[in-house]
């Protein structure tokens, strides 16, 4: 049996996640009262269906808001730890406010005495036990609908089919750190193609920039050091029942060096892991994860 607990703040994409998982063959149950979870797990674990896959949505609308008991209920049940996973979707307060303003939907915790700001904060506190216990946290603040579906498919569905998922994400430090990174490597010390007028408008995906960086000794040293580090430590995470890993590579603008290094490292690790992808945050047409 495969059990996914899907949770997150309203407006962060939980419904989208459940719809995608349903399309992928999961039986989805939204807003299940926590107290009913043990009985459901018991029933499903003894089902005649071969390897049932179930996704359960749990959020702050729950009849019993004491969600701190959720993990204890699962842990004392019949499922081994590797059979279930907690997925938590979140967004920044500013993004949630904007989304509610655009859709003009009412927040589920809003009432005549609670404004939207207070409802969002109250929901964060209620869901804290789940967010703290999450195996996978997806920040959807900068994701559109297509990108969110791609991220869920990569992090959750992809790991079902192909073992551990590894994502290399390039970014520009001037635009902020990726909040979902497990490792961050800074390649700003490497020679910068930006200062070559002929390369400035090209990206790290272009043959000209690749040729420029391939010829630099520092680039080779950085590449080999990161690759050696990842090959040593990724198996340790995998042995600890980790299903995904996000490795962020940053340069100043996120357009040349970080893109080049992410692509090259992903290509090398593809020999060891089937589900290796890249995402280049500062290149708009490559925002969805791509197989290397």
Swiss-Prot record:
Q: Which HAMAP family match?
A: RapZ_like
Coiled coil located at which positions?
Answer: none
Question: What protein is this chain from?
Answer: Nucleotide-binding protein TERTU_3824
- The family this protein is said to belong to: Belongs to the RapZ-like family.
What InterPro entries does this protein's entry cite?
A: P-loop_NTPase, RapZ-like, RapZ-like_N, RapZ_C
Q: Which UniProt keywords apply?
A: ATP-binding, GTP-binding, Nucleotide-binding
Q: Which GO terms describe its molecular function?
A: ATP binding; GTP binding
Q: Which residues are involved in binding ATP? A: 8-15
Identify the residues that bind GTP. Answer: 59-62
Q: What does this protein do?
A: Displays ATPase and GTPase activities.
Q: Which species is listed as the source? A: Teredinibacter turnerae (strain ATCC 39867 / T7901)
């Amino acid at each position: 049996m495969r059990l996914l607990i899907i949770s997150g703040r309203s407006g962060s994409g939980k419904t989208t996640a459940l719809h995608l998982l349903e399309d992928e063959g999961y039986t989805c149950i939204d807003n299940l009262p926590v107290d009913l979870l043990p009985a459901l797990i018991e029933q499903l674990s003894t089902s005649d269906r071969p390897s049932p896959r179930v996704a359960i949505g749990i959020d702050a609308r729950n009849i019993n808001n004491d969600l701190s008991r959720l993990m204890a209920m699962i842990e004392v049940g019949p499922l081994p730890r590797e059979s279930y996973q907690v997925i938590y979707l979140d967004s920044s307060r500013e993004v949630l406010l904007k989304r509610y303003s655009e859709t003009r939907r009412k927040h589920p915790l809003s009432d005549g005495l609670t404004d939207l700001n207070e409802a969002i904060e109250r929901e964060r506190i209620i869901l804290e036990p789940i967010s703290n216990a999450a195996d996978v946290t997806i920040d959807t603040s900068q994701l559109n609908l297509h990108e969110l579906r791609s991220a869920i498919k990569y992090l959750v569905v992809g790991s079902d089919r192909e073992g551990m998922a590894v994502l290399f994400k390039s970014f520009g430090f001037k635009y902020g750190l990726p909040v979902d990174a497990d490792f961050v490597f800074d390649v700003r010390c490497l020679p910068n193609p930006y200062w070559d007028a002929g390369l400035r408008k090209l990206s790290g995906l272009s043959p000209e920039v690749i040729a420029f960086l391939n010829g630099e000794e520092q680039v080779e040293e950085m590449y080999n050091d990161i690759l050696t580090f990842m090959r040593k430590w990724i198996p340790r995470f995998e042995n600890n029942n980790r299903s995904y890993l996000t490795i962020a590579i940053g340069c100043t603008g996120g357009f040349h060096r970080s893109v080049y290094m992410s692509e090259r490292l992903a290509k090398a690790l593809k020999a060891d892991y089937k589900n290796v992808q890249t995402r280049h945050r500062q290149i708009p047409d490559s925002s969805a994860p791509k197989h290397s």
